[in-house]
Amino acid sequence: MIIGITGGIASGKSTVVKVIRKAGYQVIDADQVVHDLQEKGGRLYEALREAFGNQILKADGELDRTKLSEMLFSNPDNMATSSAIQNQIIKEELAAKRDHLAQSQAIFFMDIPLLMELGYQDWFDAIWLVYVDAQTQLQRLMARNRLDKGKARQRIASQLPIEEKKPYASLVIDNSGDIAALIKQVQSALLLLANPR
């Protein structure tokens, strides 16, 4: 059984993943996969450098992720170019990791922030959506990424609204409350997985 984890930016997916890992389950983290592919010499690093030139690199040759993010979120054409380049490479890498893990794990998870936006729904037996109301999401993103309201709204707007993700979810984990309530919901869901009714 493969379970997809998704949610809006700053919804609390990382905390959910920590609880799942603590319970002994394997989680493939799409953001980490992307990070690895963007390392100097990686497939995405080379593809992005070819598309946007050396202006997206730091002095030491590493990818300047902050500069790249600013370029993408401020220009829809850049975002479209980047998505076209990256999505296929990422999909291939995630599929390879999924197939490898499926050989040894009966149940595992994949944390994919843009799961619905990029059409990964068919990969999963279940989808867990980490939900947070719009105001809380905005405040958390501004605090976490030190963004002003305008930039935070821009990032949230680049994803499918969380309400539109709900119909795809087999389980909605509500993170509008405190961290203890969030952890309790995840632990209950994991208990049901281990002991299905």
Curated annotation (Swiss-Prot):
Residues 2-197 form the DPCK domain. It catalyses: 3'-dephospho-CoA + ATP = ADP + CoA + H(+). Keywords: ATP-binding, Coenzyme A biosynthesis, Cytoplasm, Kinase, Nucleotide-binding, Transferase. Signal peptide: none annotated. SUPFAM superfamilies: P-loop containing nucleoside triphosphate hydrolases. Its main location: cytoplasm. ATP binds at residues 10-15. It is found in: Cytoplasm. Gene3D superfamilies: P-loop containing nucleotide triphosphate hydrolases. One of its GO terms (biological process) is coenzyme A biosynthetic process. Pathway: Cofactor biosynthesis; coenzyme A biosynthesis; CoA from (R)-pantothenate: step 5/5. Its EC number is 2.7.1.24. GO terms for cellular component: cytoplasm. One of its GO terms (molecular function) is dephospho-CoA kinase activity. Pfam families: CoaE. NCBIfam families: dephospho-CoA kinase. Belongs to the CoaE family. HAMAP family: Dephospho_CoA_kinase. Catalyzes the phosphorylation of the 3'-hydroxyl group of dephosphocoenzyme A to form coenzyme A. This is Dephospho-CoA kinase. The lineage of its organism: Bacteria, Bacillati, Bacillota, Bacilli, Lactobacillales.
